[in-house]
Amino acid sequence: MAFRTLDDIGDVRGKRVLVREDLNVPMEGAAVTDDTRLRSAAPTVAELADKGAIVLVLAHFGRPKGERNPEMSLALVTAAFRSVLGREVRFVGDCCGEEAEAAVAQLQPGDIALLENTRFHKGEEKNDPALAQAMAKLGDLYVNDAFSAAHRAHASTEGLARLLPAFAGRSMQAELEALEKALGKPEHPVAAVVGGAKVSTKLDVLKHLVARVDHLIIGGGMANTFLAARGVDVGKSLCEHDLKDTALAILDAADAADCIVHLPYDVVVAKEFKPNPPTRTVNVHEVAADEMILDVGPAAVEALGDALKTCRTLVWNGPLGAFETPPFDTATVALARTAAALTKGGSLVSVAGGGDTVAALNHAGVAGDFSFVSTAGGAFLEWMEGRELPGVKALEA
């Protein structure tokens, strides 16, 4: 897929550049508790400012539902963004209209302004052309650097890109290039790890992947549904029994596409789901009626590691077990470390995404060793489903 980037933007000196970023950071009181998204936004904003642009940052924050809510004002994020950038950032109390126009008129080349939460306007999430037009009045050029919001056709992500010359920022560019490498034009064999609690939330992902990957590793609670579909008694494990036929259809589609599906054959079980309860490691056919499967067993994890050693590309979304609760993080940590070692050794391109996945890789201490880790949740999932992302489509050259 060809798209325009900052390399194509030309001379920006004195130009007003509207830059859509994802600054939707977690807060505790007045403090930002994780500045990952601010750090991800910094390179594009700094590059444009250094080149003499007047940089106008657009972003959403929380879900104010079209109402002004001081608890969701981007004023709360301004100091942290200033600190990450290491330069002055002015806050402007609206993202369009007279107040914003007057504030922007005062700015000089190289200045950076953070405009107020786009979702304070009802038209943002409706992709209202009038709101997009009002925001477009502030700028000469548009840069979208928020892949995590690219699956939404909103006024500040899709509408604006139709009204001004539109380009991908550095974070968006890195994300798109990594995703293209992982599933667009990957080097085979390709493995996908898909985990999480429910098959129902990842149905479209699984259906899309079986025709595109060589190894499909299914973990988490959703593996129980596939095991049950194959006649395994999963005890009181989380399981969507009503989706057994769907699971069988996915397995049949995988067979037809020569995709090897890896389900656990040994598992870690417990009678209670709590930190460090008594556990047993058993064959999947030995789960007692009062036990639940909470992690993949060591023999299966070793076999999964061996499968990864034969692969050139890995896409990972979702943990293998209930990783937030020890000791059920063991399988996820072990396989993540294997993938990280293969990546560092140069034999594997590894791309991971989704909130739980990032948390799991951080927990394993290997997020920095993967080829690319996406902080996007919904957008990453929709990309894995093969859907067209409106915010990306609008940037195509």
From Swiss-Prot:
Family annotation (PROSITE patterns): PGLYCERATE_KINASE
GO biological process, one term: glycolytic process
Membrane-spanning residues: none
One of the record's GO cellular component terms: cytosol
Pathway membership: Carbohydrate degradation; glycolysis; pyruvate from D-glyceraldehyde 3-phosphate: step 2/5
Binding site for substrate: 22-24, 37, 60-63, 119, 152
Keyword terms: ATP-binding, Cytoplasm, Glycolysis, Kinase, Nucleotide-binding, Transferase
GO molecular function: ADP binding; ATP binding; phosphoglycerate kinase activity
Gene3D superfamilies: Phosphoglycerate kinase, N-terminal domain
Record-linked InterPro entries: Phosphoglycerate_kinase, Phosphoglycerate_kinase_CS, Phosphoglycerate_kinase_N, Phosphoglycerate_kinase_sf
Keyword field contains Transferase: yes
EC number: 2.7.2.3
Pfam families tied to this protein: PGK (PF00162)
Chain positions recorded as ATP binding sites: 202, 324, 354-357
Subcellular location(s) of the protein: Cytoplasm
Principal EC category: transferase
Record family assignment: Belongs to the phosphoglycerate kinase family.
Subunit structure: Monomer.
Protein name stated in the entry: Phosphoglycerate kinase
Organism: Rhizorhabdus wittichii (strain DSM 6014 / CCUG 31198 / JCM 15750 / NBRC 105917 / EY 4224 / RW1)
Gene field: pgk
